[in-house]
Amino acid sequence: MSKPTIAFLGATGGCINACLAHTLQTGYHAVALARTPSKLTALLRTQNIDQETLDSRLRIVTGDATDPEAVKSTLLLQPGFPTDPTTSASSPTPTLVSHIISGIGATGNFRGWCFEFDQPHICEEATRALLTALRNIYATYPEFMLPANVKSRPLLTVLSGMGVDPSQKQMDVPFLLRRVYHGLLHVPHADKWVMEEMLAKREAREFFRGVITVRPGSLLTGDHMLGSGYGYEKVRVGTEREEPSVGWTIPRADVGEWVFREVVVMGGGRWVDEKVTLTCW
């Protein structure tokens, strides 16, 4: 059985870069959207991904995640494309990627005692572009929206964050960390929450065969390098529906490995429509 093709948005970020590296190392095919492809390939080479693997298993689309056309090019696999094992040149209809894994988010820098963020609405804008891209694809290929073809629609996994829910239904941030955490991160948290709300709407839900929202703890420690975290076995997992995993932090490499193992390898079925919290300590 051929392995599915995975689309990555925000793959130059630590968590998703680690997930992409695992994906390529284990023989999956991937399509990644990147504003600067050379930056992405340089990061992957630091993960010991060789040029042959990059050439044979990865297609990079140059563009911005806020551009619906660039996103559309990332999601739609043309017949016979080398990195798509599910289609053949004889098939007249493109297919969609099996999974979309997105780690889009603003980048912050300290200015005095505050964090300043380069794109405070990037999650909202990227989510709007993703939905627009899929709306255009489904308008061109309405067969994807037939009830019988729901499994041909992509499974979406997005990285959000602990503490983004303004109603705080579940206190998923340790008590001693809450004031500082919300004070420093209120801008990206508001943006992540808008993203979650957009994906919860009925039309958006119909565009995917499921949505998995991953809410990691603080990502202020660790980098994207495989093996630099505590390891998959050390990750504590909870859900908003039952009980979140309350903790201080989790390395980026561990988030990427968890998404790879649970979503790419195992298919993600256990976590569909869940808001999954991840911590290590």
From Swiss-Prot:
EC number, as in UniProt? 1.-.-.-
Q: Which InterPro entries match?
A: NAD(P)-bd_dom_sf
Description of what induces expression: Expression is positively regulated by the cluster-specific transcription factor pynR.
GO molecular function annotations of the record: oxidoreductase activity
Disruption phenotype annotation: Leads to a reduced accumulation of pyranonigrin E.
Taxonomically, the superkingdom here is Eukaryota
Q: What organism is listed for this UniProt entry?
A: Aspergillus niger (strain ATCC MYA-4892 / CBS 513.88 / FGSC A1513)
User: Which pathway, per its entry?
Assistant: Secondary metabolite biosynthesis
Give the record's keywords alphabetically.
Oxidoreductase
Enzymatic class: oxidoreductase
Matching Gene3D superfamilies:
NAD(P)-binding Rossmann-like Domain
Its function, per the record, reads: Oxidase; part of the gene cluster that mediates the biosynthesis of pyranonigrins, a family of antioxidative compounds. The first step of pyranonigrins biosynthesis is performed by the hybrid PKS-NRPS synthetase that condenses 6 malonyl-CoA units to an acetyl starter unit, to form a 1,3,5-trioxotetradecane-6,8-dienyl-ACP. The enoyl reductase (ER) domain of pynA is likely to be functional during the first two rounds of polyketide chain extension, to generate the saturated C-C bonds of the alkyl side chain. PynA subsequently forms the amide bond between the acyl chain and L-serine.
BP GO annotations: secondary metabolic process
UniProt similarity note = Belongs to the avfA family.
UniProt-recorded name of the protein: Oxidase pynE
